Design a protein with these regions (language model features):
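Extended catalytic cores of very large enzyme megasubunits
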Residues: 1-474
Length: 474
């Protein structure tokens, strides 16, 4: 193709020449040639048969490929490329090396991309294995000795690569996931067998069928059809073991609880997660603090604390943290909140959003004067009135200047919230990107399906979306 000398007969003759050389030099089933061996013979065959232009292009191609291989080995700090590294392009490997591959205390990469995807696939499959019909009883009411299982958590190093699922070994952190997963179902009375019996079954290779499940998950990832979230890539099969990307925390109007939330946020950032918080419970700036007879600094000041913590703690040593800061539209400090990010350098680790309820829309659309009441966070009493049209204009202007704030339609979200009664109140916060509404101390586990890889070519040469493959992946 590079020399515009495409010819099927020529290609066949060259192939026969290469095969003849391989055979004459003793290569075969018992002594397979390397890629370099084959490429050397292709090169010499082209020259011997007088195809100098094709040989020149092939030599240049090999040179470029060698440069890419050398750069890949440099990025991965290795002398040999594993199968995934050969297939992934250089930019993909740079991302894996900078974010996801395990490193030692000297910051040296200690695993290959193949090992990364295997450790992730193994941990995901452990969850499936624990729901095997020989282990899991969905109706519950089966008591087990949970303390016996918990004992294994004190001696994890004794079980590093001791068990395997088919051909895939469990490291000590996979084993920890197995123990914790078992404890979770046992506490609900859903474990049919003891943990010791589970290990007996595992040692007897009764769960080898799940090796195919591991391979399936592995192939989805290495074929770049599906990828889990970053914390899963960073932590699955590792010491931290934290797989969730997004959390929501509460922010009560109490100094001790504020500091507890700050501490929890720091731990989440450390493990690679992000946080959404509704700051509306915090009293407005200037309100009296009874315990000190002082005045409150307001919600925005506490957002600055979380912002600083985010700045200082790089997520899992890999990336900056992310926050969603929310304030209800009825909060007395709402104007300051809306305009806070119009200046550069303010709350750079935050997305901010105004939480809007039905009474605001009524004031904006239905009332003649647009009067809207801002209320005390302590007792709900009126603090002052503001024009709803002024607020919506302020939101629009600030969003035009700085792309902040967004709007969260809590009236619509809670219209379809089936958990309000069970959780004792409405949803009032979302994860950092805003796509998942959550209650405090809930998390969401995200993943991505690569739709571009789900197209197929039809008999007439056109392309269409492969709905069947999409359904299988989901």
């Amino acid at each position: 193709l590079a020399t515009s000398e495409g010819d099927r007969d020529l290609a066949q003759n060259l192939t026969n020449g290469v095969l003849g050389k391989l055979s004459s030099q003793g290569f075969g089933t018992e002594n397979p040639p390397s890629v370099e061996d084959i490429q050397d013979m292709v090169e010499s065959t082209l020259i011997e048969q007088g195809h100098s232009e094709i040989a020149k292009s092939y030599i240049l191609y090999r040179h470029e490929r060698r440069k890419i291989r050398d750069e890949k080995m440099k990025v991965l700090n290795t002398k040999v490329l594993d199968p995934v590294s050969k297939e992934f392009d250089l930019n993909c490997l740079r991302v894996l090396a900078s974010r996801y591959l395990f490193r030692n205390n000297k910051n040296e990469i200690t695993e290959s991309p193949t090992q990364l995807f295997e450790r992730v696939a193994v941990l995901i499959t452990i969850g499936d294995l624990l729901h095997d019909s020989s282990i899991f009883n969905p109706t519950g009411n089966t008591p087990q000795n949970i303390e016996e299982a918990q004992e294994y958590l004190t001696k994890l190093d004794q079980f590093n690569y001791k068990f395997k699922i088919d051909e895939y070994y469990l490291n000590q952190y996979h084993f920890r996931g197995l123990v914790n997963g078992y404890i979770d179902i046992a506490q609900k009375g859903q474990a049919k067998i003891s943990f010791k019996d589970l290990l007996t079954k595992l040692a007897a290779k009764e769960f080898t069928d799940y090796g195919a499940r591991i391979t399936e998950y592995y192939n989805l990832m290495v074929n770049q059809v599906f990828l889990p979230n970053s914390p899963t890539m960073m932590n699955a099969g590792g010491r931290l073991g934290q797989l969730s990307a997004c959390f929501v925390l509460g922010m009560p109007d109490d100094m001790g609880k504020i500091m507890k939330t700050t501490s929890d946020a720091a731990l989440i950032f450390k493990s690679g997660g992000g946080v959404g918080i509704n700051y509306s419970e915090l009293r407005e700036e200037g309100d009296i603090v009874a315990s000190t007879s002082g005045v409150a600094s307001g919600p925005v000041s506490f957002m600055n604390i979380i912002n600083t913590v985010t700045d200082v703690i790089k997520q899992g040593g890999k990336r900056r943290g992310a926050n969603m800061g929310i304030m209800d539209v009825s909060h007395p400090d709402i104007e300051k909140f809306i305009t806070n990010k119009t200046e550069p350098g303010v709350l750079e680790n935050f997305n901010v959003s105004v939480g809007v309820w039905g009474d605001f829309w009524s004031a904006l659309v239905d009332s003649e004067d647009g009067a809207y009441t801002l209320r005390s966070t302590r007792d709900g009493s009126p603090v002052r009135e503001i024009n709803a049209h002024h607020l919506i204009d302020l939101i629009a202007t600030s969003a035009w200047k700085s792309a902040e704030p967004g709007l969260i339609f809590f009236d619509i979200i809670n219209k379809y919230n089936v958990f309000a009664k069970a959780r004792g109140g409405p949803l009032r916060a979302t994860n950092p990107c805003g796509e998942q509404s959550l209650y405090p101390y809930e998390s969401c586990n995200l993943g991505s399906i690569n739709l571009a890889n789900l197209t197929k070519r039809t008999a007439d040469g056109q392309y269409e979306f492969d709905w069947q493959k999409y359904e299988e992946i989901v």
